[in-house]
């Protein structure tokens, strides 16, 4: 089974080796045909502390690192 990969924006980078990434999902409601934006925040592991707030990053599923961290930063474009 392939690992999930999401693209998002770093919203919080204050903790050591941990960042909060906000991922946008856009979908259309089947009944009302309205476009809906849904944001979800993921806690991701940043090994090198290289990410800053506002950076675009790719996160990938990983085995649990801590209670809430189950994602790892794969690629960050500054």
Swiss-Prot record:
Any GO BP annotation: translation
Keyword Ribosomal protein attached: yes
InterPro entries given in the database record: NA-bd_OB-fold, Ribosomal_uS17, Ribosomal_uS17_bact/chlr, Ribosomal_uS17_CS
GO cellular component: cytosolic small ribosomal subunit
MF terms (GO), sorted A to Z: rRNA binding; structural constituent of ribosome
NCBIfam families per the UniProt record, alphabetical: PRK05610.1, uS17_bact
Function noted in UniProt: One of the primary rRNA binding proteins, it binds specifically to the 5'-end of 16S ribosomal RNA.
HAMAP family: Ribosomal_uS17_B
Family as reported in the entry's similarity comment: Belongs to the universal ribosomal protein uS17 family.
Complex formation: Part of the 30S ribosomal subunit.
Record protein name field: Small ribosomal subunit protein uS17
Source species: Wolbachia sp. subsp. Drosophila simulans (strain wRi)
Name of encoding gene: rpsQ
